[in-house]
Amino acid sequence: MASFRLLLLCLAGLVFVSEASPAGAGESKCPLMVKVLDAVRGSPAANVGVKVFKKAADETWEPFASGKTSDSGELHGLTTEDKFVEGLYKVELDTKSYWKSLGISPFHEYAEVVFTANDSGLRHYTIAALLSPYSYSTTALVSSPKE
């Protein structure tokens, strides 16, 4: 239990530090950002495949956006404020491919976060994930858009 609390504390610190540093002009307009950390190596998780889906009226998940995390473990520019409308979204991280590329056999095929966005007006979302081969933890930072 103490290890789990420590992981959550580290993840919360990651989000706090990343949000405390000034964002570039392009980042301030990014309504959905993903940040991934490798808990084993204590570093950003680069080249993690990310898929975003939006729940359609017929209850199916439609592809919405995709990309890979940068060397800093971040993925910006997934969508625009105009396209990121109110709805139910799913962010899927390809954790299996990430760990396999490091020569590690993981337990999970992927990690996913399902959330409702913009139900109280336009917001910006940072989805942060802390990965290990046999577990993952996620948190989110939801903020008002910066002018």
Swiss-Prot record:
PTM-bearing positions, type 4-carboxyglutamate: E62
Any one of the GO CC terms: extracellular space
Major location category of this protein: secreted
Stretches assigned to coiled coil: none
Keywords: Gamma-carboxyglutamic acid, Glycoprotein, Hormone, Phosphoprotein, Secreted, Signal, Sulfation, Thyroid hormone, Transport
Tissue expression as described in the entry: Highly expressed in the choroid plexus.
GO biological process, any: purine nucleobase metabolic process
Cellular location(s): Secreted
Gene3D superfamilies: Transthyretin/hydroxyisourate hydrolase domain
PTM annotation (Sulfocysteine): residues: C30
SMART domains with a match to the protein in the record: TR_THY (SM00095)
Residues recorded as bearing Phosphoserine in the entry: S72
Pfam families per UniProt: Transthyretin
Biological role: Thyroid hormone-binding protein. Probably transports thyroxine from the bloodstream to the brain.
Name by which UniProt lists this protein: Transthyretin
Species this chain originates from: Ovis aries (Sheep)
Gene name tied to this protein: TTR
